[in-house]
Curated annotation (Swiss-Prot):
Pfam families: Ribosomal_L31. GO terms for molecular function: rRNA binding; structural constituent of ribosome. GO terms for cellular component: ribonucleoprotein complex; ribosome. SUPFAM superfamilies: L28p-like. Keywords: Ribonucleoprotein, Ribosomal protein, RNA-binding, rRNA-binding. Belongs to the bacterial ribosomal protein bL31 family. Type A subfamily. The gene is rpmE. This is Large ribosomal subunit protein bL31.
């Protein structure tokens, strides 16, 4: 294999929406950094049966709805 082709993996902390912290190996950030998730499998409608609503933290959902409001979505 070629040297210095792939980034180095290190352990980071991933903070779930319920406050739980999970250690994972990743190329994101630096060793020991914490990645806080806005949405994870415990609250995502795809894994919870669709009953939960997504939080519109970045305004993307409302922007999409406004753009396509005449199509009846």
């Amino acid at each position: 294999m070629k040297k210095d082709l792939h980034p180095e993996y290190h352990v980071i902390n991933v903070k779930m929406t319920n406050g739980d912290v999970v250690e994972m190996r990743s190329i994101w950030g630096a060793e020991g950094d914490t990645l806080a998730l806005d949405i994870d499998p415990t609250v995502h409608p795809a894994w919870t049966g669709g009953g939960a609503r997504l939080l519109d933290t970045g305004g993307r959902v409302s922007k999409f709805k406004k753009k396509y409001e005449g199509l009846g979505f």
